[in-house]
Amino acid sequence: SFYAYMSWNFSSTAIRQGVKAINADTYDLMSETDLRRAWWDPTGSYDDLPLTSFQAGSIPYQNRKFTARAVSNAVGDVAFLRLSEMYLTAAEAYARGGNTAKAQEIFTKFQVTRDPAYAGGGDLIEEIMTSRRIELWAEGLRYFDLKRLGEDLVRGRNFDVTFCTFLEKKAGEKGWTWEIPKIETDNNKLCEKNY
């Protein structure tokens, strides 16, 4: 289950030894009044971890976004499409399409529910994309955002290359595109190799 891998409180090796954490640089983009800050612990000193065995693997910026039903029950709701994603997608589409007023209206309506002190004023598209990155953290969308926008992957200062293979990857770089299997390119002459 997703919660057996991603929650902070279910007792599984994937959680105790493979702790999930937000990029510290992304965390720092949130204002002090952003309610989503509670989804992570920047100190890594959880006093309320369900078992003492969890404490050995506790790290700064550890996930608190996903909570399983219990230490021995990995059940949890998995949202395949969230309303917040629709708000952020609409705001981005209007902003990129030149309708800044509509984009700001939609984004502000969404953002004040996360950050009551939100007042805007920055680059609107950047604000939308930052909020999208925070809101949809670990929900499987970041890779596709980077690919569609042609942006580089930068993991940040709190990642260990031992566990993630690389810390940075340039857009379009080899190993950053899903390769079409060789058997497909060998047998389908209309399919071009991308490896």
Feature map (PLM): residue ranges:
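Acidic/polar-rich alpha-helix caps and helix-coil junctions
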Residues: 1-20, 30-195
